[in-house]
Design a protein with these regions (language model features):
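Active-site helical microenvironments for divalent-metal-assisted chemistry
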Residues: 1-256
Length: 256
């Protein structure tokens, strides 16, 4: 990721794109501690006897690594990996996946290296983080020729030697789409198009309907805002019903 690095106290290099002091912390800001507790509670629901000491350690390492970094919303950056980890826990993934979710941006966006991750959490977690980093570096440019999107989807799947890498990347994209309102209109359209062309179809292929449907929903919100808003206002139906309508609209306009 070609960004200018800046030096902060403690010899921590961070990407300038992730520091936005002009943005106030949102009023509905949820503290990292609250999110961490939610993560632990979610894991306990499907793995009540699991030793979570490594997850706690990964959270502390990620929080320290991302210290001084902020999201476009003004929130501390650690909010993002925490939310990614929560999504993975909601899907009942294993401990290594959740640890990798907490650490998925440290190699790309902090001074931590893959070797650091391996030394602290083992080769398995390091390989997951490295896989997510490589997928993030895939260059996507929308083209109307469907075969190009299909080729990129195949490359995406082929590059991920472990299916958990894709799960982490899907969770990463889902949280980014959930917070897309803080991006510029151009970025909203770009990322929504990419999400609908690449990520939603991959989620569908993997049978993760929960993520696939929400990615479609959020993408449509920015790609077809008038249609989406009319749908929300005029169609007084439950969420599954709205999802069915969105699916039909996407099919009619030729989106994946």
């Amino acid at each position: 990721m070609p960004e200018n690095n800046i030096e902060l106290a403690g010899n921590t290099n961070i990407k300038t794109s992730q520091v936005d002091k002009s943005v106030d912390t949102p009023a509905d800001f949820t503290s990292p501690e609250v999110l961490y507790n939610k993560l632990i509670e979610t894991i306990r629901q499907y793995h009540p006897s699991s030793d979570l000491s490594d997850i706690e350690r990964a959270y502390k390492v990620a929080k320290e690594a991302h210290e001084g970094q902020f999201r476009k919303s003004g929130e501390p950056y650690i909010i993002h990996p925490l939310c990614v980890a929560i999504i993975l826990a909601e899907l009942e993934l294993d401990k290594e996946s959740i640890i990798a979710g907490l650490l998925h941006d440290v190699v790309e966006d902090t001074v931590m290296t893959s070797e650091d991750v391996a030394r602290e959490f083992g080769d398995e977690v390091a390989l997951l983080v490295d896989g997510v980093t490589k997928l993030t570096q895939l260059n996507y440019q929308h083209d109307k020729i469907e075969v190009q999107a299909e080729n990129l989807r195949k490359m995406f799947l082929a590059m991920a030697k472990d299916i958990r890498v894709i799960m982490i990347k899907l969770a990463d994209r889902l949280h980014n789409m959930r917070t897309m309102q803080y991006q510029s209109p151009a970025k909203q359209v770009e990322k929504s198009r990419e999400t609908m062309d690449i990520y939603a179809p991959i989620a569908h292929r993997l049978g993760i309907s929960k993520i696939k449907v929400e990615l479609d929903d959020l993408s449509m919100k920015y790609l077809m805002p008038d249609t989406y808003n009319d749908l929300v206002k005029q169609v007084d139906i439950n969420r599954p019903g709205r999802e069915a309508v969105i699916k039909r609209i996407i099919k009619e306009v030729g989106m994946h």
